[in-house]
């Protein structure tokens, strides 16, 4: 079995948001979701400074439907048998 070596000498990431992800190597994502609602800011100035965040999170969420994966259009059809076309009748 061959081995894979990934050398990362310098990696700097400035921002990741929403459903963002960092993948080093092979990966497969099936319908990634993010079920968090936050309002505020998170900032860091310079390479070695600590992060500072000012967040306001409220419990009131009137639109509850976006907090679930029911009705998600991303479905997995991996290795599914093909659907046969309907016969043509003359």
Curated annotation (Swiss-Prot):
Pfam family, one: gerPA
InterPro entries xref list: Spore_germination_GerPA
Region (Disordered): 25-90
Biased composition (Polar residues): 30-54, 65-79
Name under which the protein is recorded: Uncharacterized protein YdgB
Protein's gene: ydgB
